């Protein structure tokens, strides 16, 4: 058996290599965390935009069903009352429910004020951002 000193037989990383890796990880974390936060805010805003499209689709479907019914269109209040504005547990309306003229919709940390144009006998109501 060959004789080796204790220092020659030890293997591993040097202190310089460990510090270099920690510095690189710190730089990556400093760059990645703000991007992640921006990504979350952007996703929440896109979810609100999708909700506006969903509300417009529901408004059009409800208006179409009313127009095809025997009674036909009577008033915007009747049309708005028939529209399902519950978008699920992740969305909340300021004040609990929207008004016939609009409301504030919140998803996550993002809120969006919405306006609603009234329906008429010739067109459904439309949701939009100011």
Model-derived regions, located:
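Extracellular/periplasmic head regions of type IV pilus-like filament subunits
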Residues: 64-118
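Internal alpha-helical transmembrane segments of multi-pass membrane proteins, especially GPCRs
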Residues: 11, 17-20
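Conserved short hydrophobic patches within well-ordered secondary structure
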Residues: 1, 23, 36, 55, ...
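N-terminal leader/signal peptides at the extreme start of proteins
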Residues: 1-13
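Aliphatic-rich helix starts adjacent to a transmembrane/signal segment
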Residues: 35-53
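N-terminal alpha-helical signal peptides/signal-anchor transmembrane segments
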Residues: 51-69
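Short, low-complexity, Pro/Ser/Thr/Gly-rich segments in the mature regions of secreted, periplasmic
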Residues: 118-130
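Alpha-helical hydrophobic helix detector
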Residues: 19-35
